[in-house]
């Protein structure tokens, strides 16, 4: 038999095996290619997911840091307003100092003319007594009010920013889901039997845009109303602090006159007692006193506040839908009533105490006259002037100071208190809440 015939005969006999082998090899190659493709695709998706998670974390971190900066900028904007409120409520220390200078000039003129018609010395003594009392009241009131204001602002902005972030994330997810549905060919083929998908999509987009615009305006007004709650402590709430502090100062400094002398340690001890007794009245069970200082007690107080901060059109629109506002206020109230908030506010007040004692001590020592370097006791009049200067520094702001580099040292000190940052992070990262919010005290 010829070789060619033997080869053909061999192939014919093993043709089935060859075909099976080739088919198996092709199947293995195809399967391997598919497996490699899906593995690469899975790895790509995993890498993309990790990248997205990292981006989201960085975005959340940047938004958090920006929110804390915005809180500080807000305080810079509010301080000049409250400074005017203090001056209107008879706590303008510069006015008293001006009157003292006028009295000194009048006394000089009276001596030169040998006039006996008036007794400026008595009036001057009254002014010094007034300066002593009001400088103490203003200094302590400023520490409590500004500490509370920066805490309230942090809570407000972190709650609001987190809420906005959640809303935007939900809307983005819904948009992606809708887009995926429209891109699904089978879905489009089925729906095309009873309607034109393009017309339906256009109508839905128009209606959604109108609805979104209306809801966006309502949400914006609700958020503005929520932010305007700081009006309360600047115009009403601080008066509660002022009343408590005034009573404590009158008790602690009773019988201490401007010419009487105290050491820095004695002055610090008396001031410590004032802070301790004030804290005991503010931080009671459930922080009810603190809540009434920071927020209106009832709906009538809330309505009065909103009438002072919103224009007529915005107020009308607000009353048509207050859902978002009520949700935000409920969470803010729960935050204020929590133990964590009490701890943070006490930390801010303690930091304020150390700040003012350091400043008052430096300013008092600096007022020593030549030859008095070893003097350890100072007249209350000297303390009063030092406290006046300290108050001025604590409330000092210039136009755009927070952006231009002119920093209020007191605000910078409070802004760097670690428990405040911890509470802010806790509120901001409370992503377990839904639109109804649920902060745990």
Swiss-Prot record:
UniProt keyword Transmembrane present: yes
InterPro entries reported for this sequence: Peroxin-3
Transmembrane segments: 18-39
Keywords recorded for this protein, A-Z: Membrane, Peroxisome, Transmembrane, Transmembrane helix
Ranges of the Peroxisomal topological domain: 1-17
Keyword presence, Repressor: no
A single BP term in Gene Ontology: ER-dependent peroxisome organization
Consequence of gene disruption: Lack of this protein causes the peroxisomal-deficient phenotype and mislocalization in the cytosol of peroxisomal matrix proteins.
Subunit structure, as described in the record: Interacts with MSP1; leading to inhibit the translocase activity of MSP1.
Misc. remarks from the entry: Present with 1400 molecules/cell in log phase SD medium.
Full protein name: Peroxisomal biogenesis factor 3
Originating organism: Saccharomyces cerevisiae (strain ATCC 204508 / S288c) (Baker's yeast)
Gene of this entry: PEX3
């Amino acid at each position: 038999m010829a070789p060619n015939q033997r080869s053909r005969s061999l192939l014919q006999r093993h043709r089935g095996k060859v075909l099976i082998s080739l088919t198996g090899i092709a199947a293995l190659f195809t399967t391997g290619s598919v497996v490699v493709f899906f593995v690469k695709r899975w790895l790509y998706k995993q890498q993309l997911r990790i990248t997205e998670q990292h981006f989201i974390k960085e975005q959340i971190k940047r938004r958090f840091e920006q929110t804390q900066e915005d809180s500080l900028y807000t305080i810079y904007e509010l301080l000049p307003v409250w400074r005017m409120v203090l001056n209107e409520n008879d706590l303008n220390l510069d006015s008293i100092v001006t009157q003292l200078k006028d009295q000194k000039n009048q006394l000089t003129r009276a001596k030169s003319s040998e006039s006996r018609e008036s007794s400026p010395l008595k009036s001057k003594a009254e002014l010094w007594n007034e300066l002593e009392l009001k400088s103490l009241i203003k200094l302590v009131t400023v520490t409590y009010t500004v500490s509370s204001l920066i805490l309230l602002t942090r809570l407000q902005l972190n709650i609001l920013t987190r809420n906005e972030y959640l809303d935007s994330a939900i809307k983005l997810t819904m948009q992606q889901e809708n887009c995926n549905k429209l891109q699904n060919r089978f879905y489009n083929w089925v729906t095309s039997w009873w309607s034109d998908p393009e017309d339906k999509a256009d109508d839905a987009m128009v209606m959604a845009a109108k609805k979104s615009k209306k809801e966006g305006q309502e949400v914006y007004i609700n958020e503005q109303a929520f932010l305007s709650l700081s009006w309360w402590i600047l115009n009403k709430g601080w008066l509660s602090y002022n009343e408590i502090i005034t009573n404590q100062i009158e008790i602690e400094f009773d019988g201490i006159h401007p010419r009487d002398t105290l050491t820095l340690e004695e002055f610090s001890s008396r001031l410590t007692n004032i802070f301790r007794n004030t804290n005991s009245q503010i931080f009671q069970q459930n922080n009810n006193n603190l809540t009434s200082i920071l927020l209106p007690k009832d709906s009538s107080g809330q309505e009065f506040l909103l009438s002072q901060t919103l224009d007529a059109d915005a107020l009308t629109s607000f009353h048509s839908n207050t859902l978002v506002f009520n949700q935000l206020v409920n969470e803010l109230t729960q935050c204020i009533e929590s133990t964590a908030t009490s701890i943070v506010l006490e930390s801010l007040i303690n930091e304020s105490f150390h700040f003012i004692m350091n400043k008052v001590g430096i300013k008092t020592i600096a007022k020593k006259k030549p030859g008095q370097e070893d003097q350890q006791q100072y007249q209350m009049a000297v303390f009063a002037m030092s406290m006046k200067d300290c108050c001025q520094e604590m409330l000092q702001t210039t136009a755009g100071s927070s952006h231009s580099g002119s920093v209020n040292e007191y605000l910078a000190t409070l802004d760097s208190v670690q428990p405040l940052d911890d509470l802010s992070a806790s509120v901001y990262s409370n992503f377990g809440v839904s639109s109804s919010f649920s902060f745990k005290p």
